[in-house]
Regions:
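Conserved amphipathic alpha-helical segments that form helical-bundle/coiled-coil interaction surfaces
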Residues: 2-66, 79-87, 95-106
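C-terminal effector-binding regulatory domain of bacterial HTH transcription factors
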Residues: 93-125
Length: 125
């Protein structure tokens, strides 16, 4: 039920905050996945869950390469999770959905920038 989901999400966000303070990268990533998966599972949207499952290995690789040493990004992630959860708790599901979409899109920006730089670099002889 919704109260259980909210309690679980609150617990995950609280744990994430502690992991950022302790610079516990692997635990933070595990909690990040738990946060997203909890929302997706509760949505009842099988297509969304399948898309998440189909792309999680690629996503984990992306995160490991581009975000591992970026503690400020971890802090931003926790803040975004708080905002998503707050909107959800307030019953503003449209806002929660928009915040979740923005959260995912923002995470892709460093990868796009890196790929653009590689495309613009002159080829080595």
């Amino acid at each position: 039920n919704q109260a259980k989901v909210i309690a679980r999400l609150e617990g995950i966000v609280a744990q994430q905050s502690r992991q950022v303070e302790q610079a516990a990268y692997r635990r933070h990533q595990s909690l990040d996945k738990q946060f997203h998966r909890t929302f997706f599972d509760y949505s009842g949207n099988a297509r969304l869950v399948r898309a998440y499952d189909d792309n999680i290995v690629l996503w984990d690789t992306h995160i490991a390469i581009y975000f591992k040493d970026y503690r400020s990004i971890w802090t931003r992630t926790v803040e975004q999770h708080r905002q998503i959860l707050s909107a959800y708790q307030a019953g503003d599901y449209q806002m929660a959905q928009e915040l979740m979409a923005a959260h995912f899109l923002e995470a892709v920006i460093p990868l796009k920038e890196l790929l653009s730089q590689e495309d613009a670099a002159p080829a080595a002889d």
